[in-house]
């Protein structure tokens, strides 16, 4: 019985550690979003958050909205706590309802990978380092639907590599994080609530050479050209009550 209790406490501690790591990541992104919205950084309103197991990996989603009156900045954030088995081209997007307008060309995105790299240095020592690669996605590289209600980015999930040589270079990818951000405003003074939606589409099989159609509105998801069962999706909704 004591052993069972000990294992149970151990599981609780592990979950708490994962939650703390997730919170630190979200706080880091929140700081970046707030920096972009410095003049309007009055109130930060997070969504409840959503998590799921996709293709052997653990994915977290959350939406952060920073408001000042009826103007705001909003970021949809994803985090792969553990990466999925199959890694190809994924997509992540953020959309809004029709009660709001986007500040022209304010949208942007960013994603990053953390990994360990092992190699032989100039002193002929075999070392392992922790690194992070960060990629910015400017406005003109984002995808958007025909009505401009949503913005999304496509990116590849990295594959780890192990050297066949005893002291060759090996790379082990650990996690991935990213966000899509834009600035907006509420159109009508009579509006009392606003919805935003974040959607992650993970390609889990390479059988179809299919892709995602971003030309159609994706209020609650993307349009998959064909073989949509080859994609796994996770969504999050943010309700802002004014």
What is the predicted role of each segment?
Residues 149-151, 155, 159, 194, ...:
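Glycine- and small hydrophobic-rich membrane-insertion segments that are intrinsically disordered
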């Amino acid at each position: 019985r004591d052993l069972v209790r000990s294992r149970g406490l151990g599981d609780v501690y592990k979950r708490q550690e994962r939650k703390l790591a997730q919170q630190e990541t979200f706080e880091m992104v929140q700081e970046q979003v707030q920096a972009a919205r410095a003049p309007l950084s009055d109130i930060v309103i997070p969504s409840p958050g959503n998590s799921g197991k996709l293709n052997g990996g653990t994915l977290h989603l959350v939406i952060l909205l920073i408001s000042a009156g009826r103007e705001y900045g909003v970021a949809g954030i994803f985090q792969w706590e553990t990466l999925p088995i199959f890694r190809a081209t994924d997509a992540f997007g953020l959309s809004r309802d029709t009660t709001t307008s986007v500040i022209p060309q304010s949208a942007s995105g960013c994603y990053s990978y953390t990994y360990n790299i092992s190699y032989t240095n100039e002193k002929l020592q075999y070392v392992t380092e922790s690194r992070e690669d960060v990629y910015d996605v400017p406005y003109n590289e984002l995808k958007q639907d025909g009505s401009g209600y949503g913005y999304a980015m496509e990116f590849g999930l990295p594959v780890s590599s192990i050297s066949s040589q005893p002291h060759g270079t090996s790379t082990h990818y650990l996690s991935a994080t990213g966000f899509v951000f834009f600035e907006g405003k509420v159109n009508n003074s009579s509006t009392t609530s606003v919805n935003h939606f974040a959607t992650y589409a993970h390609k889990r099989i390479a059988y179809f050479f299919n892709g995602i159609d971003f030309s159609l509105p994706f209020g609650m998801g993307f349009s998959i050209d064909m073989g949509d069962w080859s994609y796994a999706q996770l969504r999050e909704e943010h309700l802002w009550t004014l």
